[in-house]
Design a protein with these regions (language model features):
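Alpha-helical scaffolding within the catalytic cores
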Residues: 31-36, 74-77, 206-212
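Active-site catalytic motif of lipid deacylating hydrolases and related acyltransferases
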Residues: 35-135
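Bacterial N-terminal signal peptides that target proteins for export
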Residues: 2-11
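Disulfide-rich extracellular domains of secreted proteins
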Residues: 62-65, 69, 80, 84, ...
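Serine-dependent carboxylesterase/thioesterase catalytic core
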Residues: 119-235
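C-terminal catalytic-base region of ester-bond hydrolases, centering on the histidine
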Residues: 213-311
């Protein structure tokens, strides 16, 4: 059978369309929640979110971006808190050591950990150390590498209480490969602080060894840990693959090896990426548990691990 010229061109055109689609910049949406405003009075709650590594085809960390803010995950967490009458402000950051960088896959410049550290330093000065100012409660949200950054932030700020930490399948894979060059050229740690490049190193906790990103510091009152599926399973509404390509298996622990204040959910239908979407089984669990914990704030409860929490 002889194909006409149009039929012969069809596979080429389809391949070209796929290539062009892969090169097309991603559409990024700003969170709908009020943005962090360090020039104004403090809100009741601040939610800081750090996204993880970009999905293929991309080149990390150059093409990493703040997808938790864009896809509505940050808004979902902020909304669960705001629904109980709290004034909430949010800020989202990308998986990078740099303060600002321009990925090829998105149009808008992205802000990395150095920007988060600078924002946090201003927050401490204006809202936590200024006399007569009631500081906000702090909530940390991280996915994949983002959880490495949020754990590091809490670890190097032991004088600041965090009301809640949310870990969505925190992963250390490619941490050193992605970040060692930028962290060597632009260190983000203050003098005397642990190095950020060591945030995935193994440390002894109790009788075992775990990575630093799996340690929940004592200045964090509660930790909600999500892990993605281990076995092949049909996907949920948030999409993903039948077979998971990357997943966390280590359980978060306290520095003494206990699990005090830590809750865990294994999402048996969702892969590493799918758990980060607002319509996922994982986020449904996170939002339910967040709402329950926030209800406890109204009663003035404080964790025994963190007696200095803002009532």
């Amino acid at each position: 059978m002889t194909l006409n010229p149009a039929a012969r061109l069809l596979p080429v055109l389809l391949a070209l369309a796929l290539v062009l689609a892969g090169c097309r910049p991603l559409q990024v949406f700003a969170p709908r929640s009020p943005a962090l405003n360090l020039a104004g009075p403090p809100p009741d709650v601040v939610v800081l979110a750090v996204s993880g590594r970009c999905g293929p085809p991309c080149r990390a960390p150059r093409d990493n971006w703040d997808y938790l803010g864009s896809r509505g995950t940050l808004d979902a967490v902020a909304g669960a808190i705001a629904a109980q009458g709290y004034r909430v402000q949010v800020a989202g950051y990308a998986d990078s050591a740099l303060a600002s960088f321009q990925p090829l896959k998105v149009v808008a410049p992205q802000r990395g950990y150095a920007a988060l550290a600078a924002d946090f330093a201003r927050m401490k000065a204006h809202w936590f150390r200024a006399p007569g100012v009631r500081p906000p409660r702090l909530v940390l949200l991280g996915h994949s590498h983002g959880s490495v950054w949020t754990h590091y932030l809490a670890q190097v700020n032991p004088d600041v209480p965090f009301a809640l930490m949310i870990d969505l399948d925190g992963i250390c894979a490619s941490w050193n490969l992605d970040h060692q060059r930028d962290l060597r050229a632009h260190p983000v740690e203050a003098p005397g602080q642990p190095r950020a490049i060591d945030a995935c190193n193994l440390v002894r906790v109790g009788r075992g060894m775990v990575r630093l990103k799996d340690v929940v510091p004592l200045n964090v009152a509660h930790d909600l840990e999500v892990q993605s599926k281990r076995l092949p399973a049909y996907r949920s509404d948030s999409g993903g693959f039948f077979v998971n390509y990357l997943f966390e298996v280590t359980l978060n622990v306290r520095p003494d090896g206990s699990s005090a204040g830590i809750e865990r959910f294994v999402s048996v239908r969702e892969d590493h990426s799918a758990v980060s979407y607002p319509n996922s089984d994982a986020l449904k669990w996170v939002l339910e548990r967040t709402a329950s914990l926030v209800a406890g704030w109204k009663q003035g409860s404080a964790s025994p691990l963190n007696p200095g929490s803002v009532p």
